[in-house]
Amino acid sequence: LFATVLAISASTSALPAIANPISNPISSQISTSSIPAKNIGISGSNQFTQRSLNLAKQIPTDVIGLVMMDLEPKSWQMLDTSQATDPVTAIDKLLTSFGQLPQISIVKDIQPWLGKEVLIAFFSNTDNKFEFTFTALSTISDDKKFEFFLKKLKSLDLPKPIETLYQNVKILEWQLEEDSVGDKKPVLSHKLNSRNSLQSLLRLKQNTPTNTKDNEEDSDPEEIEPTTPIFLNFSIKRFAIAKLPSGIAVISTNRQMIQKMIDTSAEMPEQRLPSLADNPLFLRSLNNPLWNRSLIAGYGDFKELGKISELLAADLPETSEIPGFSRKEYIESLQYTLSQYSSFDLFTWVTPKGLRSQSNSYFSEVRSPIPKDSATRDRLLSYLPSNVYGAITSRNLNRQWQWFVEESKQQSTYKILVEGVRMLVPLMIGAGFDLDIEKDIISWIDGEYAVVVFPSDRSPFQETGIDLTIGALIRTSKPEVANATLAKLTKQLSKLSGDFIQVKKRQIGATVLTSFEFPDTRESGKTQSIFAYGWRDRQTLMLTLGANTASAFIPIPKPALAESEMFRDAISDMPQPNFGYFYLNVNVIAKQVATLGFLLFASNSDIPPSQDKSSQPVLPDEIKKVIDRLGGAVFVYSETSDRFQSDLFFGLKP
């Protein structure tokens, strides 16, 4: 965020889609979206699309990506009906909560002149391919307060700014670190709090005595802590700030980027650089009605992202025994993936029931439509219990696996997944066991499948205080193949475990289960089930941790997950068809985490005498109020002929 960047700078420092034959060029896919900027129709009261376009006119077209945030408090008020939410104030509180005490106050020094929107953009550095250029823009609501802010910025304990006049625009630049001379190498941080960070630089500037140079000369090189590069260092070496002729404030880690932005508004057409507002790919995203509804919207260019592939692979070794983990293999795989797509966008908005987000990765060329699947969908949702921690549902694992196998021939990074799965059986059961995981297991999972984590007082882990258990349902058109595999696995496990694990038959309702059981230490002669499987119907296989937990699925649970209001709210406007749901009951999970955290905290603190230490702790009202607002969250993937789409819903109660 613009305000955050200014405060920190001055004071303290997409999943590939299932491949389909390619037919139509990208031009046909964006022809209806590449409407000239002047013809964009604006809907909605806040005109976020138009305000975004005004800032985009200052952005050079070679941007890697950008994020646009609406700072209008009334746009956020649906998140909290009791009062208008101010996102800038929230950011200031967030920094304070992390112990940041900046010399520049976001609320006092920046918010008074900050406009109603902020844009953050990322560029590759043309002078150094191992660096990003980070730039933020915002309209100026009060020129005098902006000038006062610049005056205060100059008064800080920072190197004296360099003033440059470019096309009659004054640019102030602070050089915080010396640029490296010679070959440009990827900048790697040696530890989390790098001495190269701006925060450390300021601390050293304030605390280092005047004879530091002499001390450094006398220091023993062997006493210097050896460090190993771990991750890329995005520390700020310099930053520049200016007010563009359009009245927009800009801060950037590269002065030349500000100059390019000035050139996008040059009076002479022959001197004017093309801006993002002229880019048809960006206009396609901007014309999406979701942009105008969004609190946060984003756009990115895969072609520009590919230019920094060497930066992304900077820490990888030249050679590796692990497939796909050498620098060359990684870059080749990354470039192949990026070539399949043209651009991406992101939208996040508020609904009466919670937060919604959507991300689209557009194919480089329009693909043939996915063959229509007439099979019944989401049947298993009616067989799952409603009281769950989380659930994953999808369909046709066999087809998904075949796609991964084909992609691994083009992308070496997928080889580790494919080969890893193929090695599972030898690693878990032994190399002498005759079982092909692809032919004997994956091949018959050709229908819907679901995995669910849920609470149960019959969990096999109940005696340890854990009520969590796991169950799975699998629809298949090849039950005979599944039975042959299950019989083979049962025989092998019985052989390996000797007399410790016993295989018994259990019955839950009308379903007969094969149960794997071990001696119950609590009662002599009894056994306890750890895993069970059986056929819920002729084509639905059920697997559970513990035979008794199967009662959650048999007979049809009432209410089922499909009937849960929280789940229905989460999936109500998700695209259909899709690849399945990844669902979390955030409310229940948050209660469990908070209770566990309170127990851990209470065990190390003084508990009031009136509270019974052996009883279940009562959460503070403030925490309960926050948790009670939480609902369910669901993540969904889908695909059309022109894009791969992901959707997210996060439930929030009023």
Which residue ranges define each predicted feature?
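Gram-negative bacterial Sec-dependent N-terminal signal peptides
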Residues: 1-18
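Charged/polar, solvent-exposed surface patches and flexible loops
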Residues: 57, 77-81, 93-96, 112-113, ...
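Short secondary-structure boundary/capping segments
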Residues: 82-86, 265-269, 312-317, 362-364, ...
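Structural boundary/hinge residues at secondary-structure and domain interfaces
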Residues: 13-180, 297-300, 304, 356-460
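Leucine-rich, highly hydrophobic segment in Treponema pallidum outer-membrane-associated proteins
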Residues: 18-51, 55-58, 216-266, 275-395, ...
